[in-house]
């Protein structure tokens, strides 16, 4: 989907890879994409999203969420908004899109995220990536990014 949308994934330098490994379980995957796995508590989501926003080498985030009991959909939605607001207070803002999969509860969480400025879509990975691609095409056309 990223290639189709005109986006590319960066190769993580070793220090960034190690920074993500501090937060994810050994059976997760650092690198790009980062996979924290579905059984992680809210703090893991917060820490990895925060790291992605804080590191200047990362320009945007595509969040993929699958409904879990440990971090239910609305908990995920609210923690994403919380971390975004925390970073905005520090002057850090980056494009973020989200894909949520699961049952009808992910629809509510996607709507919550959307209402708080995060383009979020239930049951689709392609749409949020296409939205991010459109943002980048516009920004390139406006001369804001290369």
Where are these regions (language model features)?
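Peripheral docking tails and interdomain loops at the edges
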Residues: 1-5, 77-146
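Short glycine-cluster motifs
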Residues: 1-66, 75
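Short Asp/Glu-rich motifs
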Residues: 21-22, 72, 108, 132
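Short secondary-structure capping/turn micro-motifs that flank functional sites
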Residues: 18-19, 69, 129-130
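Short, small-residue-enriched loops and turns at beta-alpha junctions
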Residues: 68-72, 103-104
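Short, glycine/charged-rich beta-strand-loop motifs at protein surfaces that mediate ligand recognition
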Residues: 67-70, 96-98
């Amino acid at each position: 989907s990223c290639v189709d949308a005109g986006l590319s994934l960066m190769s993580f330098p070793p220090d960034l890879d190690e920074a993500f490994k501090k937060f994810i379980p050994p059976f997760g995957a650092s690198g790009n994409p980062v996979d924290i796995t579905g059984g992680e508590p809210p703090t893991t989501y917060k820490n990895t999203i925060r790291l992605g926003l804080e590191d200047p080498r990362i320009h945007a985030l595509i969040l993929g969420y699958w409904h879990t009991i440990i971090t239910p959909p609305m908990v995920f939605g609210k923690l994403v908004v919380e971390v975004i607001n925390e970073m905005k207070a520090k002057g850090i803002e980056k494009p973020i899109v989200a894909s949520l999969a699961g049952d009808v509860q992910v629809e509510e969480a996607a709507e919550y995220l959307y209402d708080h400025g995060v383009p979020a879509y239930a049951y689709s990975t392609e749409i949020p990536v296409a939205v991010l691609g459109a943002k980048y095409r516009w920004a390139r056309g406006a001369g804001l990014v290369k």
